[in-house]
Amino acid sequence: MSLLFFFAATVDAHGPVRQKAEEEITINAPAEKVWVIIKNYDDMSWLPAIKSTTADKGNDKGSIRVLTLKDGGTITEELKKYDDKKMSYAYKITDISTLKTITHSGAEEKVPVFPVDNYAASIDLEAKGDTTVVSWKAGYYRAYMNNNPPEEMNEEAANSAVTAILKSGLANLKTLAEK
């Protein structure tokens, strides 16, 4: 009987699970035209949620960029890989500012403006004649790394936030590139 209780308790008590999101869009424009819009690591003007971007080393690996959000707050990212010929780059989030503080399970918890942890992503373009397929992939954990997360930092909050960013970014990129 005690073995059964132990098994049931361990199944219920688990931490966060790595999440994955991928969005893809076909743009009716040549890859070179699309790449010109997104290739500069220090320019995220194509992403609707971003007010401004600064980066310390441009498109060089290790470049740190700070995204200032239109709704307030910042996200700091590091460029991990950049390939101009393949029209792709990869980055990871290194810091996220706090949106608010809540009390959860008797403790004060800082809710980040983007409810994820250990977030890494890549953007890849593939030329298909006069069209371009843009793929944006992300891997991440929910923001709350312990068991019993608050609503603001659970898997659903993380998945919703990531999906919204990827979809809105790609939709706006399509609009800009097809002008």
Predicted regions, residues:
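Hydrophobic ligand-binding cavity/cleft-lining segments
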Residues: A9-D60
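Stable alpha-helical elements in mature extracytoplasmic
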Residues: P30, I37, I75, A158, ...
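Structured segments of extracytoplasmic/periplasmic soluble domains
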Residues: I37-L47, Y82-K85, K128, G169-N172, ...
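Glycine-rich portal/gate segments that line the openings of hydrophobic small-molecule binding cavities
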Residues: S45, T53-N118, V133, L176-K179
